C-alpha cells in the first residue's frame, strides 16, 4: 500500500541544505510504487502543527526543482521548535493524528543537533504507540559537531567560504608595509571550533596568515593572547587572527560576555557575538597598533558563490540514502558519512541510531590543536581539505545567480 512522505527543514540553514531536500524529493519521485504524495513542511514541525504544508511535486511544473539544488537557505523555511521531553504531552497525539490524516508513512527532517532531537522523540513516541511511520534524520550543520559521522553537510561549503574570505582579508591587510596592524576575524562556532579551524586552509605557505587561531575547545588566556600578538607582530606586521565566537576563559566565561550582557534563544543557547570586537579594543588599548575586527556572520552559511562541489554532492546523497533507508524499513536513524580514505578521498554512507546522536557534540580532537592552543595541526588540514574541493557553476540571469523562491 502506498504511503505519503513528508520532509522538513529546521535550525540554521546552510548553503547546501536544499541539496539534501532535492535528494529526498527526487529519490522519492523514483519510488512510485511505495510513495504517493510528497509533502513539504513549511517552517518545520512547528509549521506542520499549524497546518502549513506544500506539494513538492508541484515544483516539477516550474523550473523551481532544478534551481532548488543550488539555492542557499532553507527553501521550506525553518523553525526552532523544541518538542517536550515528556512523551505524554498532548502535542504528540496531536502530531500523529495529523500524520494519520495526511497518510504519512515516511518522515524526514533535515537539520542539526536539535532537529535530531525531534527525530528521536517522534520515533520513540511512534514505538510507544506501535505506529509504523518511519522517521529519518538527514544531517546538516556548518558547525560540523554531530557525532557518529565523519563530517556534516554544510561544513565543507562554509569551510571553503571561511578560508576564501580569510585569504582575501589577509591580502587586503598586507597592502601597507609601514604600519603594524591586527585584524581579528570572528567565525561561527559555539562549543566546537571546526569552522574556525578551517581558516588554516587559507595559508599558502608556512608562516602565512592567519598566524593565530583560537577555538572554544581550549581555554582562552587574555594575557597569553596579547603576548602572542606582540611576538607575531615582529615577523608578521599585518597580523590576522581567527577566533571562534564561543571562545571562553578557564572559568567558562565567553569572551563576548566580557563586553556586556547577551541574550538566549528558544533552546537556551547564549547568542554569541562580539568576541572579535572585544579583542579589537583590547589590542588597541594594550598594544596600540592599528586594529580591525570582522564578523563573517550569516554569510558563512548562505554563500552560494563558494559552494563546494564535494559538499553539495554529499548533501544530495544524504537525502537520497535517507529515502532508501526508510524504504528498507529503517526508522529512528540519521544518515552518517564514513570516510574510507583521505588520498584519494573516498566516502560511504551508513545510518546510526539518532538517540546516540542527538544532544551530543563533537569537538575538534585535542591532538589536532597545537599545544599552545593557538593553531591547528597538519592532521586537521588533511581532514578538511578534501571537503572544500570542486566548484559549482550556478545558473545565472543578468549577471546574478538564480535561486528557487517559495511563493
Name each model feature, range by range.
Residues 256-407:
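C-terminal non-catalytic interaction/assembly regions of soluble proteins
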